């Protein structure tokens, strides 16, 4: 049976609908950076998702290629994730989507090296006749965070975020969003096929002990 990150690491991908504190270890990702409204059908976000999955599936199917990855095992491609920010805003202003800056990512299994990643970019570009130059290998050490499962529309996320922040403060922590530590979302539902009120999204914010 294929390894499923969501099931094997439930503390990171399947939190409860009540906030919790978690320490997230360093992970490697396929990443594409961009800006603008993610709902724009002609925008960079939709293109970025296509690039991410192009590399993700090239790596997953590498077992059938001449490039054999050391330590490879069958796995389910992890869910799409995103880091979001806006210049001059702490957190996220959902009413002004045009000002979004984002890094769209998909997690890589630990056995994938930078060399394996570079092979996948070259392989995907040759096979799909696409430009994959925007895709990068991102190592990210998220650390101490508060997180919660949000059920519902993306536009309703502020209510869940407020629950997270209230919980965080009760536990003696404070928000630690910086230019390196960002608002993080993990998308467990396909927005194209799921009613808005049923969308499942993990929301995660970086925190630190209050006063430190």
Show which residues each predicted segment covers.
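A solvent-exposed interaction/effector surface
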Residues: 1-212
